[in-house]
Amino acid sequence: MKRGLFSFFIFLTLHVPLGSYAQAVKGVLTYAGEERLALDGEWAFYWKQLLEPGYEAFTANPPTYVKQVSYWNAHQELKEQLPAFGYATYRLVVKSTQDYRVAMEIPGFNLSYALFLNGELISGDGVVSDSKGTYVPDWTVSMKTVMLHEGENEIVVQVANFDHSNGGFFKPIIIGDPDILPHERDLNLIIET
C-alpha cells in the first residue's frame, strides 16, 4: 500500500505541471501559452467602486495596486486596513503573445462577483451591489473556456461582500491549456476528498 501511494505521488510530481511563476506588475501580466498560469501579482484595485469594463472608466480613476492573492481586508500595502464588508473592482491586463483558447479556473469570491473578459461577462455568482439591501451572496468555483487575443486582454472583477469575515478573493484565477487544466482540477478535487 505504501509503495502504491509513493508511486502515485511520484507520478503527480512528474506529470502535473506546477505552472509558471510570472507575476503581474502594476496590473499587467504576459501570457505566452503556459499550460498553467496563476494570475498572481499586482492587480489594480478600486475600493468602494464598481467600475464597468473599458479603458475610459479606469483612466479616470487612478488605481491602488494590491498583491493578489489576499483578501482586501488583509492587504499590507494599503494605507489603512479595509473592513471585510464593502465592494470593489479589480483589474488586470493580460498581454497575450498570440491568440490562445484557454481554460480559466475561477475560484469562489467572498461573496458575490461578476468577471468580465474584454468587456464580456463570462462568469459571476450572486448579485454584486454597493448596498447590502440589493446584494445577493453566493459562492461557486467555475471553469470556463475563453479566447485571449493577441495583445491586451482586460480582466475586470467586481466583488461585493456584506456577509463574510473576509472580502475579495484568496485563491488566484488560473488560466492555461484547456486540454490540461480541467483534468488537473479534477485530480486535485479527488486528492482533497
Report residues per predicted region.
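Positively charged n-region of N-terminal signal peptides that target proteins for export
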Residues: M1-G4
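Bacterial N-terminal signal peptides
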Residues: S7-H15
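An acidic-aromatic loop/edge-strand motif
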Residues: V28, V136-T193
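Hydrophobic residues positioned within well-ordered beta-strands of beta-sheet architectures
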Residues: G41, Y90-L92, M104, S142-K144, ...
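Solvent-exposed beta-strand/loop surfaces of large extracellular or lumenal domains
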Residues: P62, E120-V141
